[in-house]
Structure formats: structure tokens, C-alpha cells
Design a protein with these regions (language model features):
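Alpha-helical solenoid scaffolds that mediate protein-protein interactions
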Residues: 54-57, 61, 95
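Helix-turn-helix repeat elements of alpha-solenoid scaffolds
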Residues: 41-53, 82-85
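Conserved positions within tetratricopeptide repeat
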Residues: 66, 82-89, 104-105, 158
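Terminal, low-structured helical/coil segments at or just beyond the last alpha-helical repeat
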Residues: 65, 110-194
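TPR/TPR-like (Sel1-like) alpha-helical repeat modules
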Residues: 86-101, 128-129
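Alpha-helix C-terminal capping/termination sites
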Residues: 77-81, 151
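Amphipathic alpha-helical repeat scaffolds of TPR domains
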Residues: 9-37, 64-78, 102-118
Length: 194
């Protein structure tokens, strides 16, 4: 449910500026760090602090401007929970309705992340994960068409699969992988013996 702030004026402007500032901090992060490394642990702590700040601001209602909605959605998409990503998808959908460039893709990506965290197939195929051997798309719902992807600013499935196959980054230490990823690796046949 969309609950815009009932109050007008400085509070709304300050909150929008704060959300956009949090997004700038998020986008300035070096995300090319391997899971389990100290730099990754520190990154996730900063991500968590930004999400907590966003949730406090959203407690008074959703922002009314597209850029602030987009900023909040982007930060929640870096969450650890399906519910955070699902809220990010709804915020991005509203930002798209208001005409924010990039918001349709973000709504799709956040929905996919929410589904992935719930151990369900993605709708669009935006999440690429390590599988202990290489990089792959998290499972994708075969009923979703490339036309649906394109309508949401997501590349066709074959292009996303090629992107995953082209990644040559080292695999993170899978000993600390989330249980959901370890179960998926078992399903994919890539989980190394214990």
C-alpha cells in the first residue's frame, strides 16, 4: 500500500535529499569484493546501515518523488531478506509509474532478488550467482517471455545467460555460502563434497 507523507514542506525535501544521499553512498561502494573477505563483511555492514536508515524514513510513508523512490528501492535491493527486495520492487514500480529512468529494470531486478531469496525461480533472470564452478543465472521461470523482459528494460534471457558465462571472476569461498545457495548448488550438481 502506498502511504505518501501527509505533511508538506521541509520534511519531505529533507527526506528525499537524504534518500538520494544514501543512494550516492551506495553507488560509490566497491562491489568487486569476494564474499567472506573482510572488505565484503564491512560492505555488508554499511549496506545494512543504509537499509535501516531507509526503513526509518519509509515508516512515515513513501516519498512522492520518483528519484527518492528509486533511491530507496536501490538500497533495499541490496538487502539480505526477500521482504526487503520485494519492498524495493514495489518502490521501483512506483518510481517507474512516475517516469524515473531505470526504474522498470530495478523493479524487475528487485523482484528477482526477492524470489531468489525465497528460493524460487526468478521471473526475469537478472541475478547471476556463483555455483562453485562458474557463474550462472539463478533459476528462471520458463513462462516469462523475452517480450516481458524487454518491456521491463531487462535484456533477453540468452543475453543474460551469455553474460553469466562470460564472468571470469574467482569464485568466492563457498564454505560460507548462504544455505539457499548451497541447496541450489546441490540441485545444480555443483556443490563440492563436504
Amino acid at each position: 500500500m502506498v502511504r505518501p507523507l501527509r505533511r508538506r514542506g521541509r520534511l519531505i525535501v529533507d527526506r528525499s535529499a537524504a534518500l538520494i544521499g544514501l543512494l550516492a553512498g551506495d553507488q560509490a561502494e566497491d562491489r568487486a569484493v569476494l564474499a567472506g573477505e573482510p572488505a565484503y563483511v564491512a560492505l555488508r555492514a554499511r549496506d545494512r546501515a543504509r537499509r535501516e536508515a531507509v526503513m526509518k524514513m519509509l515508516a512515515d510513508g513513501w516519498p512522492e518523488d520518483a528519484d527518492a523512490l528509486y533511491a530507496a528501492a536501490w538500497i533495499l535491493n541490496h538487502g539480505d531478506l526477500s521482504e526487503e527486495a520485494a519492498l524495493g520492487s514495489r518502490l521501483a514500480t512506483r518510481a517507474a509509474e512516475l517516469g524515473r529512468p531505470g526504474a522498470r529494470w530495478l523493479a524487475a531486478a528487485a523482484l528477482d532478488r526477492s524470489l531468489m531469496y525465497a528460493e524460487l525461480p526468478q521471473k526475469y533472470g537478472t541475478n547471476i550467482v556463483p555455483d562453485g564452478v562458474g557463474w550462472r543465472l539463478w533459476d528462471v521461470d520458463p513462462a516469462t517471455t523475452d517480450q516481458e523482459r524487454i518491456a521491463n528494460d531487462v535484456p533477453p534471457l540468452a543475453e543474460m545467460q551469455a553474460r553469466a558465462a562470460a564472468i571470469t571472476k574467482p569464485q568466492p569461498d563457498m564454505a560460507g555460502a548462504p544455505d539457499s545457495l548451497r541447496r541450489a548448488m546441490r540441485r545444480w550438481g555443483t556443490l563440492p563434497p563436504a
